[in-house]
Amino acid sequence: MQLELLNEQGQATAKVDAPDTVFARDYNESLIHQIVVAYQANARQGTRAQKDREQVHHSTKKPFRQKGTGRARAGMTSSPLWRGGGRIFPNSPDENFTQKVNKKMYRAGMASIFSQLAREGRLAVIDSITLDAPKTKLLAAKLKAMNLDHVLVIADEVDENLFLASRNLANVLVVEPRYADPLSLVFYKKILVTKAAIDKLQEMFA
């Protein structure tokens, strides 16, 4: 597979050979869906909590006598059948949403995403991306010159200048290959990869 090599003006100046094992795999929609959903599920935190009938603070006194009232029998007001009572199946902050994806499937899914991005023309290569100072406007100017406004940059090494400059750009994410995730790959309109990062991606996902 050959990918376009962009200059600092966003023009394709040459072609770069990329490993077919990562950038020319068959499109596997179900596997991609699985690893994206698993990534989102594993990022979830237990932020919901409700009380069951044991946890609500109600009297345990029987609200009315068992027989003779014509009403349905009731033992306590904390019953889930009563207004203000506990939930039958309450949400718990200890709930585990983890979904396991084995390494072989994850590598295959990531390679399938990279391959589809290459086929759609959303993946491009640049020699390197460096900044002289940690200034957001410097990085914004570089990306604007390449006509990139919604982009994931995968650099072989993210130095402090590049990291600090990218933090304040809403639609720009700069990561090293080891931090590339399936959700970001499918979310961003354009993926910009440095030449040195291609070798690292091959080691990880081939």
From Swiss-Prot:
SUPFAM superfamilies: Ribosomal protein L4 (SSF52166). Gene3D superfamilies: 3.40.1370.10. GO terms for molecular function: rRNA binding; structural constituent of ribosome. It holds the Pfam family Ribosomal_L4. InterPro entries: Ribosomal_uL4, Ribosomal_uL4-like, Ribosomal_uL4_dom_sf. One of the primary rRNA binding proteins, this protein initially binds near the 5'-end of the 23S rRNA. It is important during the early stages of 50S assembly. It makes multiple contacts with different domains of the 23S rRNA in the assembled 50S subunit and ribosome. Forms part of the polypeptide exit tunnel. Part of the 50S ribosomal subunit. Belongs to the universal ribosomal protein uL4 family. This is Large ribosomal subunit protein uL4. It comes from Leptothrix cholodnii (strain ATCC 51168 / LMG 8142 / SP-6) (Leptothrix discophora (strain SP-6)). The gene is rplD.
